[in-house]
Amino acid sequence: MTVPASAVALSRRSPWLGAIEDWLWQKPSFRMVPDLKLPLTPAGTAAPARPGALRVGFAGFPSDYSLAMLLGLIDSGVELVGLATSLGANPAISGENALSQIADHMGVPLLRLARINEYDSLVALRRLEADLFMVASFDQILREKALAIPRLGWINVHPSLLPKYRGPEPLYWAIVNDEKETGISFQRVIRGIDAGPLLLQRREPIRPDDDSGTLARRLSQLGAESTREAVELARSGAAGSPLDLAQGSYFTSIGHRRIDQAESAALADRMVRAGNPNMLAATQCGGRLCYVVKVCRIPASDLSPGPRLHFPDGDLLLEQTVDRCGCHHGQPVGTCPHDE
């Protein structure tokens, strides 16, 4: 596994952050689920940024994807002045998690905000005196008062080729819809969902065997490598290119979709890969419901042993199933609120 080629070694500022970066990029698959806790105990404190560095805040969740973007931001040489996250997405956000561990190590506050646009949240954001805020996975829409706090505004990093696949599940829908290419986009934040002007975009092919986890890892690497350039564009006052939303698309969040109700084996296969590892697909298997991690498409004439589903275009062999949902609820089969 490779690390972002353009990253400055975090160990120059903090051996612990360098070790966390090494640990993260050894993962073959990234999760978007906001329950990440770092395996290494923070040691010491990070060295300060260079004098005169841009003061930047970060808003996101404790997930592999957000952590990669945060480390890329720190790598870019800015002065990290604070972190913000959104309460309610997962119980882990209220306790010790990847964001709180890094905030403690960097000596900056972590704001756990239930409603970012309310008065107390705005006061807390102003106290950070940030020049710029970067967002990577955040489930609240910022209004004008919040947007006006940092003098250089907010930038959002989104894992799709905007304006395509705006919304909370771009990786899922790109795989399900059999797209051949996606990417990472940096944009100005305006009031709206992934609707602001585009600052920077990088493209990435979708491989035939990709699931959401392998694709998320490569897009995270693209994002981490591009963060320095995006920050410099924001610093320079670049307005960005307006998105033509009429030429784009918006897709909603999804649950544990039932592949036994899919119209074809090809679609069911894409649903399984798209749902792994964040929102696993589900099916009836041996008279009970289960979550599906891995399948194999085979001809109907193939007599390979194991549970299978039949479709007009062939069969789907269920190679790996589990009894817990794997999403941020972490519930046994049949009890997750996202079951369909």
Stretches with model-predicted labels:
Residues 251-263:
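Acyl-group handling in specialized metabolite and lipid biosynthesis
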Residues 119-129:
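Short amphipathic alpha-helix with an adjacent loop that forms part of the alpha/beta core around
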Residues 56-73:
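N-terminal beta1-alpha1 ligand-phosphate binding loop
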Residues 2-53, 84, 261-340:
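An anion-binding loop in the catalytic cleft
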Residues 89-106:
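N-terminal beta-loop-helix "entrance" segment that forms/cooperates
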Residues 53-55, 151:
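Residues that mark the start of a beta-strand
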Residues 81-88:
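Short internal beta-strands
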